[in-house]
Amino acid sequence: MESFTTHKGIGVPLRRSNVDTDQIIPAVYLKRVTRTGFEDGLFAGWRTDPNFILNLAPYDKGSVLVAGPDFGTGSSREHAVWALSDFGFRVVIASRFADIFRGNAGKAGLVAAQVEQSDVELLWKLLEEQPGLELTVDLENRTVSAGTTVVPFNIDDYTRWRLLEGLDDIGLTLRQVEAISEFEKSRPSWKPTTLPARISQG
């Protein structure tokens, strides 16, 4: 997973609250076995409207989504995070996130930055008045900047650390590869074990 320190990109004001995972990506788009290629399904029900924000330049090139409260509610589907990332988003800013969405985001390299609703309103105003305005998200200092405007955001320490280090679940496991190997050596031969790499990769 790519590490995240700071990101600067066009902000997208999504003036909608309670955006659930089925609205983020409808279930019909989940019928694949890969983890990429979900961008076509992102907000598919809304993108049929030519005036939807992601159909308008320069917002269609945005990478920082500023949404209403309770973003990512509904069913637990990692595809919601994958669709946002595949479209090009690196950050979602909102005043409240569904817990499962926030967890999935952190594991997949998407920053879920929680700010006060008053700051969401301020960012919406700036982005609508200045289309193409770039937001700078600084994970180390937990701030979002828009020109001279700087607002703080919340993210838990553990998720922040994982994002800064670029560690997904596999990356975390591989940090313990020596301990895992030693454990495997001590296991009785009659117990289940992993296949040698040359066999499992064949």
UniProtKB/Swiss-Prot annotation:
Catalytic reaction list: (2R,3S)-3-isopropylmalate = (2S)-2-isopropylmalate
Q: How is the quaternary structure described?
A: Heterodimer of LeuC and LeuD.
Q: Which GO terms describe its cellular component?
A: 3-isopropylmalate dehydratase complex
- Report the record's disulfide bonds: none
Q: Name one GO molecular function term.
A: 3-isopropylmalate dehydratase activity
EC number assigned by the record: 4.2.1.33
The answer to keyword Nucleotide-binding applying to this record is no
Similarity remark: Belongs to the LeuD family. LeuD type 1 subfamily.
- The protein's enzyme class: lyase
Source domain of life: Bacteria
- Keywords of this entry: Amino-acid biosynthesis, Branched-chain amino acid biosynthesis, Leucine biosynthesis, Lyase
Gene3D superfamilies documented for this protein: Aconitase, domain 4
**What does it do?**
Catalyzes the isomerization between 2-isopropylmalate and 3-isopropylmalate, via the formation of 2-isopropylmaleate.
Q: Does the keyword Lyase apply?
A: yes
Q: What is this protein called?
A: 3-isopropylmalate dehydratase small subunit
Record's InterPro entries?
A: 3-IsopropMal_deHydase_ssu (IPR004431), Aconitase/3IPM_dehydase_swvl (IPR015928), AconitaseA/IPMdHydase_ssu_swvl (IPR000573), IPMI_Swivel (IPR033940), LeuD (IPR050075)
The UniProt entry, under NCBIfam families, shows: leuD, PRK01641.1
Cite the annotated pathway.
Amino-acid biosynthesis; L-leucine biosynthesis; L-leucine from 3-methyl-2-oxobutanoate: step 2/4
